[in-house]
Amino acid sequence: MPFSISKDTVSNQTTHVATAPASQRPDPVETKVEQEQGRPRLSSRDVVHAYVALTKPRIIELLLVTTLPVMFLASHGVPKLGLVIATMVGGLFAAASANVFNCVIDVDIDQKMRRTRRRPLPRHQVPRRSALIYGIILWIIATIILGFGANWLSAALALIANLFYVFVYSMLLKRRTWQNTIWGGIAGCFPPLIGWTAVTGSVGWEPLVLFFIVFWWTPPHTWALSFRYREDYEAAGVPMLPVVRDAPEVAIQILIYTVMTVAISLVLWPVAHMGWIYVVVAVVSGAVFIVEAAQLLRRANAGLRDALLKPMGLFHWSNTYLSLLFLAIAVDPLIHL
C-alpha cells in the first residue's frame, strides 16, 4: 500500500520542533538531511563513506564468495594470481555498479523503509544524478578490467547480470509481483559463471549446476529477511511474498526451495567429480539448512508471528550454508592435487 506524508503533518512537526526545549530538538544536521532542499555539509570522509555505502558492500561480499571458489574448481587447483585479481576486482566493480543503479531506482522505496531510509540517497548525502554517473563509471571500469584482465565472455556475462538486475528486477519486477525474488534473483546467479569462464573461456555443466544452486538458494534467503521487515516492505508498497501471503504459506515455499537447493548441490558431486570434503559439507550443512526451514514452518503453523517466528535464524544460516558450500568447492580440488 502507498505511504505518504501530508503537508499538514509536516507543518505540525515543524511547529513542534520550533517550540520544543533545546534538549528535545532534533539534530539540525538530521533536519537538513530529511528536507528536500539543501543537503547536509559533509566532510571528505563522510562523502567517501556515502559513495562506498551506495555500493552495498555486504551484498558484494556474498557475490564474490560464489566467484573465487569456482575459479579453483575450474583450474583443478590454484588459479593464476593475476587472473584471480582481475576477476575479483572486475566482479567487485560490476556488482558495485549494479547496486548503485538499484539505489538510484529505489530511492523512493528506501525513504519509506526504516531499514533503508538512512542510505545516502534518502538522506541527500549524494545527489541522485551524481550517483547515476558514479554507477556508470563503475560499470565501465568493471568491463575494462574483466575484458582485458580475464576475457570478454566474462565481461559480457557481468554486463548481462547487471542489465538483468537493473531493468528486469529493479524496474520491472520488484514493485509489481511477489515473484520478484525468484526471477530477479537470476542476476545473482552469474558470479559462478563469471568465475568459471574467466579460467576456461567457456561455459560447462559445472557452472550451470552452481548457477542453479544459487537460483534455488536465493528465495529462502530473501524471504526470511522479508519476514523480519514485512511491515517495511508493506509500507513501501513492495509485494514481497511475506507481505501478500500468510506466514505458513511462505514458510512452505521456503522449505520447498531449501530442499531443492540442497538436492541440486548434490548434483555437483557426479557432474564435477567432487571429493569427500564437498560431499560431507554439502550433506551436513544442507541438513541444518533444511532443519532451520522446517522449524520456521513449525513456528508459522503454530501461529507465531513477527519476532516469535525467528526468521533471522534461517537468514543467517542461509549465508553460512552458501559460504561453507563454496569454501568446500575451493578446498576439494586442492586435496586432489
Curated annotation (Swiss-Prot):
Positions with biased composition (Basic and acidic residues): 27-41
Keyword annotations: Cell membrane, Heme biosynthesis, Membrane, Transferase, Transmembrane, Transmembrane helix
Primary subcellular site in the record, as a coarse category: membrane
EC number: 2.5.1.141
Statement: the UniProt record of this protein carries the keyword Transferase: yes
Localisation: Cell membrane
Annotated stretches, region: Disordered: 1-41
Disulfide bonds: none
GO biological process: heme O biosynthetic process
Source organism superkingdom: Bacteria
One Pfam family it belongs to: UbiA
Transmembrane segments: 59-79, 81-101, 130-150, 153-173, 196-216, 250-270, 271-291, 311-331
Entry-linked InterPro entries: Protohaem_IX_farnesylTrfase (IPR006369), UbiA_prenyltransferase (IPR000537), UbiA_sf (IPR044878)
Membrane topology, as annotated: Multi-pass membrane protein
Pathway(s) this gene product operates in, as recorded in its UniProt entry: Porphyrin-containing compound metabolism; heme O biosynthesis; heme O from protoheme: step 1/1
Polar residues composition-biased segments: 1-17
Catalytic activity: heme b + (2E,6E)-farnesyl diphosphate + H2O = Fe(II)-heme o + diphosphate
Cellular component terms (Gene Ontology): plasma membrane
Enzyme class, broadest EC rank: transferase
Keyword Oxidoreductase carried by entry: no
Family label: Belongs to the UbiA prenyltransferase family. Protoheme IX farnesyltransferase subfamily.
Additional remark text: Carbon 2 of the heme B porphyrin ring is defined according to the Fischer nomenclature.
The name this protein goes by in its record: Protoheme IX farnesyltransferase
Lineage: Bacteria, Bacillati, Actinomycetota, Actinomycetes, Propionibacteriales
Chain's gene name: ctaB
